[in-house]
């Protein structure tokens, strides 16, 4: 099979599109023919050298994987040839206390796909059945590649960690990015009032067309908390969703009302943020870190995408051969939602959706 291998990380990463052996199916696993794989900021951070710890040499990146089952192990149950499926974000043993407690994404034996073990920037991938979620036949595999991440990741952050409920106010920063644009939809589906911010004027209309709530341009010098308090009758937000990280950390904190929660995810660069601790103390506020998604979050995301509650946002489909162009586009910050890669030969040119 053909696979895209990261040969050298750095400001200008180097890749090789190489021919390697097809993967073999495990006793209790499947081989998935990869139809689409999203490019996550995690992938970008490995490409540019920011993330190094635990990264496999000559790694095949990609953890946002959707495809079709083309081989099934003799002990594999609940899935058959031709079924559509998405992978989890990490491997897991399925047997330890952590896995049995529903926290398989924290399995001590886990390896991140496209990080500690090879991922989906290839024509095929072999995974165990417990690291796979079956899709409905009618589902589009391009959009489905975003189900585990970013959609499942935002489901975990908002449903489980923040416990968003109907009538609450949720502020979403970075709402034009992969995490933000789906978090806004998840929050809206939970009945929350969504206030979304983006720094990109060209994303405003497209965000508004998704119909999840109010969208504002975060211009230089604007304090978003002034707007948030004006829109919430001076109560402040119940939740601030912050996938941007340190750059808006203090601003997001100021948006919170009493007992508010800020969930932070996405940023892995290790940047520091200056914070007025009193802003947290006198709000009885909470700051929650979040990463990953479990089977139940991915299954929830599948149901919401299948029913049309959440729309996967794909800016462009690009062939493996255009990985450097995809990298540059994502680094520019101009991508709305995600770029999805298509295995070599299945797509010969970039297509906007």
Regions found by a protein language model. Name each.
Residues 22-37, 50-97, 136-139:
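Glycine-rich beta-strand-centered segment in the early N-terminal region that forms part
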């Amino acid at each position: 099979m053909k696979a895209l291998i990261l040969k050298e990380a750095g400001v200008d990463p180097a890749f090789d599109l190489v021919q390697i052996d097809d993967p073999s199916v495990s006793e209790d696993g499947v081989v998935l023919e990869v139809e689409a794989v999203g490019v996550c900021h995690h992938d970008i951070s490995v490409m540019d050298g920011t993330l190094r710890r635990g990264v496999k040499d000559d790694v095949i990146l990609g953890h946002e994987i959707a495809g079709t089952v083309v081989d099934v192990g003799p002990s594999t149950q609940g899935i058959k040839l031709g079924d559509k499926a998405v992978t989890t974000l990490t491997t897991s043993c399925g047997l330890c206390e952590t896995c049995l407690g529903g926290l398989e994404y924290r399995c001590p034996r886990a390896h991140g796909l496209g990080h500690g073990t090879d991922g989906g920037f290839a024509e095929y991938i072999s995974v165990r059945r417990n690291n796979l979620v079956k899709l409905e036949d009618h589902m589009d595999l391009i959009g489905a590649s975003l189900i585990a991440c970013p959609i499942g990741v935002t489901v975990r952050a908002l449903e489980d960690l923040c416990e968003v409920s109907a009538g609450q106010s949720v502020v979403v920063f970075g709402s034009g990015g992969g995490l933000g644009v789906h978090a806004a939809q998840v929050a809206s589906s939970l009945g929350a009032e969504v206030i979304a911010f983006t720094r990109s004027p060209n994303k405003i209309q497209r965000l508004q067309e998704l119909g999840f709530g109010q969208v504002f341009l975060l211009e230089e010098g604007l304090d978003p908390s002034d707007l948030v308090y004006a829109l919430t009758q001076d109560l402040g937000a119940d939740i601030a969703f912050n996938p941007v990280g340190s750059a808006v950390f203090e601003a997001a904190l100021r948006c919170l009302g009493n007992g508010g929660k800020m969930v932070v995810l996405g940023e892995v660069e290790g940047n520091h943020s200056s914070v007025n601790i009193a802003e947290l103390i006198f709000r009885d506020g909470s700051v929650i870190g979040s990463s990953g998604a479990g089977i139940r979050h991915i299954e929830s995301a599948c149901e919401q995408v299948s029913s049309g509650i959440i729309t996967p946002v794909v800016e462009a489909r690009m062939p493996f051969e255009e990985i450097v162009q995809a990298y540059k586009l994502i680094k520019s910050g101009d991508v709305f939602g995600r770029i999805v890669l298509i295995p070599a030969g299945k797509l010969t040119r970039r297509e906007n959706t």
